[in-house]
Amino acid sequence: MDRKVAREFRHKVDFLIENDAEKDYLYDVLRMYHQTMDVAVLVGDLKLVINEPSRLPLFDAIRPLIPLKHQVEYDQLTPRRSRKLKEVRLDRLHPEGLGLSVRGGLEFGCGLFISHLIKGGQADSVGLQVGDEIVRINGYSISSCTHEEVINLIRTKKTVSIKVRHIGLIPVKSSPDEPLTWQYVDQFVSESGGVRGSLGSPGNRENKEKKVFISLVGSRGLGCSISSGPIQKPGIFISHVKPGSLSAEVGLEIGDQIVEVNGVDFSNLDHKEAVNVLKSSRSLTISIVAAAGRELFMTDRERLAEARQRELQRQELLMQKRLAMESNKILQEQQEMERQRRKEIAQKAAEENERYRKEMEQIVEEEEKFKKQWEEDWGSKEQLLLPKTITAEVHPVPLRKPKYDQGVEPELEPADDLDGGTEEQGEQDFRKYEEGFDPYSMFTPEQIMGKDVRLLRIKKEGSLDLALEGGVDSPIGKVVVSAVYERGAAERHGGIVKGDEIMAINGKIVTDYTLAEAEAALQKAWNQGGDWIDLVVAVCPPKEYDDELTFF
């Protein structure tokens, strides 16, 4: 690096950055760039320290440190500040308004900046950009105006004259108490929620403008020739580039227009003055507009080839347009078919839901009727529950010949009979359940709470003949078996008895069901297809023998 360039760079860094830590960070970033040669990472890192408008000149100061092969890419990634003010006129009475939003003002300690543009609106159409600083409105400087004063100034005339310069940064400060910070426009989310780019609309001149730095120290020259444009297209243009020269290495091409060199505007310079400026320094910062005068240096053959190429491109675009229209038509047809299909599915689903609702209402109604009848006939159902035990109590085996010590003998004979009853009861208590069932695969430890949870598979033959009671909203707090009727499928299975808790029906957990919901679910599961019904029950714990004794 040229010592003079390095000295000027350090002087500018010391002038613009006061914080020593930020200075060290800047130098570290530059050292890492020269190791990795990743321009995009460099610019992203630089934006963390070049984070306010006053520091933007550092991007130009760093430009001489960038190799020639990266000059154009570096220029495209860094914010492009305006060289001069731009003036536009907007109609305040336009039906869609001015088409822009602004933020900032004296009370925020900064100027007024455009923060949002309505796409296709007035401001967008005249070339204003997000990140433009408004300098004058209707001829008045607004540097000492508050936000409200600026708004009032805009309302004074029907036609609003606005002068702006592009900065590429947006002030961020929600209230006067918060510190002022800045965001680059390519990182700023506007009020509409979209991220706006720091460059202007596609196709404008600034998109083709680029800035390069060339040091002539130790070289024979730029390696290019310049020419003045004709009357209808004035300006200074590159007419020849020597292969392998500095100009070729930095990316200059025939037809590029030179618009500025070292801060000197080339718009109105003649050929001799332009040559003198280019030869006046060994370090040149050149701003050009790519291919602005390319047609001035084309041969007839090149013009013919370009016209032919343009026609081919036009035909290709027409073909793409036709294909797009056909694809769009097909897409619309597919979308319409999909819409109709979804409509039919929704209609069928609604019909199915209505049918299911009516079925459920009918089931609940039948269950309520059945429950009422069952409650009226409760006593007889209790007799059906334990018929064998009752028989043992009502019809004991006749006693043998009475004896004086019949206090012992009468008890022995019925005891034999009761033993038989006990054997039968023991057969009823034998539970048939599915081996290998893991209750923790269906229920939480809190739901199980040490219960003996079993999976029963009952064959659907005849009626289930199983009655329930309780429910989540009852004092019991759960759904339990209140009766198992004789000759029903539940009784034939032998794995469920009165007092067992019903925890799941055909894989559906019912621990939080009301009685009506549980009965409806049980009825539906029984009436559905299939030969079996799966019930998960928590076995009723056995009662203590003392609970069954009555003392007189």
Curated annotation (Swiss-Prot):
Describe its partners and assembly state. Part of the IMAC/intermicrovillar adhesion complex/intermicrovillar tip-link complex composed of ANKS4B, MYO7B, USH1C, CDHR2 and CDHR5. Part of a complex composed of USH1C, USH1G and MYO7A. Interacts with F-actin. Interacts with USH2A. Interacts with SLC4A7. Interacts (via PDZ1 domain) with the C-terminus of USHBP1. Interacts (via N-terminus and PDZ 2 domain) with CDH23. Interacts with USH1G. Interacts with MYO7B. Interacts with CDHR2 and CDHR5; may mediate their interaction with MYO7B at the microvilli tip. Interacts (via PDZ 1 domain) with ANKS4B. Interacts (via PDZ 1 domain) with DOCK4.
One Gene Ontology term, aspect cellular component: cytoskeleton
Its function? Anchoring/scaffolding protein that is a part of the functional network formed by USH1C, USH1G, CDH23 and MYO7A that mediates mechanotransduction in cochlear hair cells. Required for normal development and maintenance of cochlear hair cell bundles. As part of the intermicrovillar adhesion complex/IMAC plays a role in brush border differentiation, controlling microvilli organization and length. Probably plays a central regulatory role in the assembly of the complex, recruiting CDHR2, CDHR5 and MYO7B to the microvilli tips.
The record's account of tissue expression is: Expressed in small intestine, colon, kidney, eye and weakly in pancreas. Expressed also in vestibule of the inner ear.
Q: Which disease is it linked to?
A: Usher syndrome 1C: USH is a genetically heterogeneous condition characterized by the association of retinitis pigmentosa with sensorineural deafness. Age at onset and differences in auditory and vestibular function distinguish Usher syndrome type 1 (USH1), Usher syndrome type 2 (USH2) and Usher syndrome type 3 (USH3). USH1 is characterized by profound congenital sensorineural deafness, absent vestibular function and prepubertal onset of progressive retinitis pigmentosa leading to blindness.
Look up the record and give one Gene Ontology term from the biological process aspect.
Answer: retinal cone cell development
In what residue span(s) does the PDZ domain sit? 87-169, 211-293, 452-537
The protein's organism comes out as: Homo sapiens
Q: Which residues form a coiled coil?
A: 310-377
Q: Residues where Phosphoserine occurs? A: S219
Which superkingdom is the protein from?
Eukaryota
Q: What is this protein called?
A: Harmonin
Region Mediates interaction with MYO7B, annotated ranges: 194-552
Which cell locations does it reside in?
Cytoplasm, Cytosol; Cytoplasm, Cytoskeleton; Cell projection, Microvillus
- What does its UniProt record remark on the domains? The PDZ 1 domain mediates interaction with ANKS4B, DOCK4, USHBP1, USH1G, SLC4A7. The N-terminal region constitutes an independently folded domain that has structural similarity with the CCM2 C-terminus, despite very low sequence similarity.
Residues of the region (N-terminal domain) are 1-86
Task: State the UniProt keywords alphabetically.
Answer: Cell projection, Coiled coil, Cytoplasm, Cytoskeleton, Deafness, Differentiation, Hearing, Non-syndromic deafness, Phosphoprotein, Repeat, Retinitis pigmentosa, Usher syndrome
> What gene is this protein a product of?
USH1C
Name any one Pfam family assigned in the record.
PDZ
What does the organism's lineage look like at the top?
Eukaryota, Metazoa, Chordata, Craniata, Vertebrata
An MF annotation (GO) of this entry? spectrin binding
Region of interest called Disordered, as start-end residue ranges on this chain: 401-427
Give the compositionally biased regions (Acidic residues).
Answer: 408-427
